[in-house]
Amino acid sequence: MTGTGPHGDPAEDPAGPDDTAAETDGPAEPTEPVDASEAEMTDTTETTAQTGTTAEADASEEFEGPRRRARRERAERRAARDRAMAIEQARREAKRRAVAGALDPTKSVPRNTIRGLKVLMWAALVSVLAVALGLLLYFTPIMSARNVEVSGLAEIPQEEVLTAAAVAPGTPLLQVDTDAVAERVATIRRVATARVQREYPSTLKISIVERVPVVVKDYPDGPHLFDRDGVDFATGPAPLALPYLDADNPGPNDPATRAALDVMMALPPDVAAQVGRIAAPSVASITLTLIDGRVVVWGTDDRTQEKALKLAALLTQPGTTYDVSSPDLPTVK
């Protein structure tokens, strides 16, 4: 729209160029879609323009028309929508990968876990087989005591040992209580120790250590034999060259008896064979009488080994009484 100026020249409408274009162009044509890269370039351009001087920014905002503003807003909305779609797409992809990993049979169970399960299964199978085999051997005569072997016998009859053991032939070896059998065999007076072992497939072995007589003592019912521990284990004829014991209360708990037996065990074999009688009225007064009548004054039971060595040397000298009660000063009379 034009008018006439004061001098007759056409006057310019105060409206800006954009307004004139809006009036002459008519309705705005549809704008082609702008992709995200164009939006980012627009944002970059606008950011660069905004970093200019304050005056230029104010001028740009003052002369921005409706069409440019609408275009810029549409570009911003498209960029925001594209970013939202990209985020949603990333979320869907992550979820899909997680589900695929969970359903993947090669990743569902770690290899170490599979190996551990196999070991556990084999261990359980072996345990079951072991239990089944144990039950089979325990309740069936596959491995039974068909033979009973006794070793270490000298004076004890084997029948006496088998009777005391009381193991029925054909008893499964696993059902034989070896400790109980050993305790029954040890009740025999002449048995010092007894040991029972299973020897598969069908043998029960009994090992015995018999008591050995060291001294003998006369009783009204006959001679009683005593071993090195002072145990009265047999009644009967005394072996030759076995010394007689003179003690008030012989037994394993009598100190005088134990002292006399310690002296006999300390003597050299050739000297012990010469002893005919050992008297121990007390621990402090021990006397030996040799077969030929010589007397040995032993005294107390201390320093027994020294006294035994001194006596072996003194007996080579003539005399009737040998005093080793003081091993530092032995005498011969």
From Swiss-Prot:
Bilayer topology annotation: Single-pass type II membrane protein
GO cellular component: cell division site; plasma membrane
This protein's record includes keyword Cell membrane: yes
Subcellular location: Cell membrane
Residue stretches spanning the membrane: 119-139
Record's keyword terms, sorted: Cell cycle, Cell division, Cell membrane, Membrane, Transmembrane, Transmembrane helix
Matching InterPro entries: Cell_div_FtsQ/DivIB_C, FtsQ, FtsQ_DivIB, POTRA, POTRA_FtsQ_type
This protein's name: Cell division protein FtsQ
Domain of life: Bacteria
Biased composition (Acidic residues): 11-22
Domain POTRA: 143-211
